[in-house]
UniProtKB/Swiss-Prot annotation:
GO terms for biological process: 'de novo' CTP biosynthetic process; pyrimidine nucleobase biosynthetic process. Its EC number is 6.3.4.2. One of its GO terms (cellular component) is cytosol. This is CTP synthase. L-glutamine binds at residues 351, 379-382, 402, 469. UTP binds at residues 13, 186-191, 222. It comes from Stutzerimonas stutzeri (strain A1501) (Pseudomonas stutzeri). Allosterically activated by GTP, when glutamine is the substrate; GTP has no effect on the reaction when ammonia is the substrate. The allosteric effector GTP functions by stabilizing the protein conformation that binds the tetrahedral intermediate(s) formed during glutamine hydrolysis. Inhibited by the product CTP, via allosteric rather than competitive inhibition. GO terms for molecular function: ATP binding; CTP synthase activity; glutaminase activity; identical protein binding; metal ion binding. Mg(2+) binds at residues 71, 139. Catalyzes the ATP-dependent amination of UTP to CTP with either L-glutamine or ammonia as the source of nitrogen. Regulates intracellular CTP levels through interactions with the four ribonucleotide triphosphates. Residues 1-265 are annotated as: Amidoligase domain. It is an enzyme of class 6 (ligase). It comes from the Bacteria.
């Protein structure tokens, strides 16, 4: 029977509930338990797919094609369990399903209310998402006291009662600030946060106290006294120089032992040797490279969370310190490609819309002409094709129909038909809704033997995740290939271009898929490892 650990946050947001939850999950997994994780988002959007990256950050795409919260990326990077569409849902999704049933008449004329109809749907989704896991960690977005979170917290209260105390526990993250002028940490915000929780019928079993430093024993004892939590369950979680230290920090304080004892689970001790290796490689690199990342959402780096982590993972695998130089593509437009001087490689990630695209195209040209290692992802591949068409073929009006519907040479256009992650045929037009209408999820791709991308993966068939609605125009491919553009990866059915490479270049690879979604700190990802190795080779030749 599944045990549930519900995770809430108090005092302020951005305490790191996702990292703390994933770290505990990693320890429990290291003890041989089957673990899964869920994220409940209180906002009213159906999913984050159409939300601004500046507001929400990255949209993480699961293997089965769900557009989800970026915390699911943390979950997959910390545990081996693959997330699905059942591991993340929002208030909007819950209300959408309940209202659809009401319209069908499923409720037989009953008055639809938050309690019991909305809370019942939340509980149903939690149980479904947990599946047959030994332990399911369920993170609630936002902070206690937010009006949006109330239905979720009420559903948790009910579910704890229904499954019993031996199958459910509540872990609450809270802020314990250090006041420099007083020279001490303050526990009062934590006390008030727990008081708020208890007022809605929830007593925390574990308190994870976030601070910029370790919390002393006397403060932990005081927190335990005033919050009715066992002293051993008051955990100090200070800032760390890498998030991959967190499993070790929690384990050292016995959090996993407390959870296992509380649930009455029989399992082995935790083997965190893999995480020790990751931390050692991260903190003790032997080499160093500087890579320019040219994007259009640089004001909020969370928009590229998985990509930044994937570059870190590639560094871990080769014991290389990867210094990312974040450059806004609009700055390239305004100040020129001189901003790229001195880097060992260039990375252009995905994005949507016209803003900053010309800066990305100029970046591609700089990388191609100066023989600097280049990796383009999604839009980064599309601008690579546009640049090649303009500067090699001489099609000055070459563009994507996303940016110029009247282009004389639309080398990138809207995909109108494709197979989804389940093999079903999807059809889209310009009139389709924006939400949920892209080519999403895991798709098979065939690689060309002898190509740079094949050298990275070492096999002809791969599976990678996608999130796009525009693709290279097959009608203009013959001219592009005749001019030297290499098509080194195609979709499983051969219909869509997946990878392109530039001729006469030491390492120029651009892919339509998003390899960052499957990179992990323990295993890395072959494409990013190949990219970092190319940067190291380029740097060595410069020396």
């Amino acid at each position: 029977m599944t045990r549930y650990i519900f995770v809430t946050g108090g005092v302020v947001s951005s305490l790191g509930k996702g990292i703390a939850s994933a770290s505990l999950a990693a320890i429990l997994e290291a003890r041989g338990l089957k673990v899964t994780m869920l994220k409940l988002d209180p906002y009213i959007n159906v999913d984050p797919g159409t939300m601004s990256p500046f507001q929400h950050g990255e949209v993480f795409v699961t293997h089965d094609g769900a557009e989800t919260d970026l915390d699911l990326g943390h979950y997959e990077r910390f545990i081996r369990t693959r997330m699905t569409q059942n591991n993340n849902f929002t208030t909007g999704r819950v209300y959408e399903d309940v209202l659809r049933r009401e319209r069908r008449g499923d409720y037989l004329g009953a008055t639809i209310q938050v309690i019991p109809h909305i809370t019942d749907e939340i509980k149903r989704r939690i149980i479904k998402g947990a599946g047959d896991a030994d332990v399911a960690l369920v993170e609630v977005g936002g902070t206690v006291g937010d009006i949006e979170s109330q239905p979720f917290l009420e559903a948790i209260r009910q579910l704890r009662v229904e499954v019993g105390a031996k199958r459910a526990m509540l872990m609450h993250l809270t802020l314990v600030p250090y006041i420099a002028t007083a020279g001490e940490t303050k526990t009062k915000p934590t006390q008030h946060s727990v008081k708020e929780l208890r007022s809605i019928g929830l007593q925390p079993d574990v308190l994870v106290c976030r601070s910029d430093r370790a919390i002393d024993v006397s403060s932990r004892r005081k927190i335990a006294l005033f919050t009715n939590v066992e002293e051993r369950a008051v955990i100090s979680l200070p800032d760390a120089d890498t998030i991959y230290k967190i499993p070790g920090i929690l384990h050292a304080q016995g959090l996993d032992d407390y959870v296992v004892e509380r649930f009455g689970l029989e399992c082995r001790g935790a083997d965190l040797s893999e995480w020790d290796r990751v931390v050692d490689a991260k903190l003790h690199p032997e080499k160093e490279v500087n890579i320019a990342m040219v994007g259009k959402y640089m004001e909020l780096l969370d928009a590229y969370k998985s990509l930044i982590e994937a570059m870190s993972h590639a560094g871990i695998q080769s014991r290389t310190k990867v210094n990312l130089r974040y450059i806004d593509s609009e700055d390239i437009e305004n100040q020129g490609t001189g901003l790229l001087e001195g880097v060992d490689a260039i990375l252009v990630p995905g994005g949507f819309g016209l803003r900053g695209v010309e800066g990305k195209i100029a970046t591609v040209r700089y990388a191609r002409e100066n023989k600097i290692p280049y990796l383009g992802i999604c839009l980064g591949m599309q601008v690579a094709v546009i640049e090649f068409a303009r500067d090699v073929l001489g099609w000055s009006d070459a563009n994507s129909t996303e940016f110029d519907k009247d282009s004389g040479h639309p080398v990138v256009g809207l995909i109108t038909e494709w197979a989804d992650a389940s093999g079903n045929t999807e059809v889209r037009t310009e009139a389709s809704d924006l939400g949920g209408t892209m080519r999403l999820g895991a798709q098979e791709c065939g690689l060309e033997p002898g190509s740079k991308v094949f050298e990275c993966y070492g096999k002809e068939r791969i599976v990678e995740r996608h999130r796009h609605r525009y693709e290279v125009n097959n009608n203009l491919l013959p001219q592009l290939q005749a001019a030297g553009l290499k098509i080194t990866g195609r979709s499983g059915d051969g219909a869509l271009v997946e990878v392109v490479e530039a001729p006469d270049h030491p390492w120029f690879v651009a892919c339509q898929f998003h390899p960052e979604f499957t990179s992990t700190p323990r295993d890395g990802h072959p494409l990013f490892s190949g990219f970092v190795n190319a940067a190291l080779e380029y740097k060595a030749k410069k020396a």
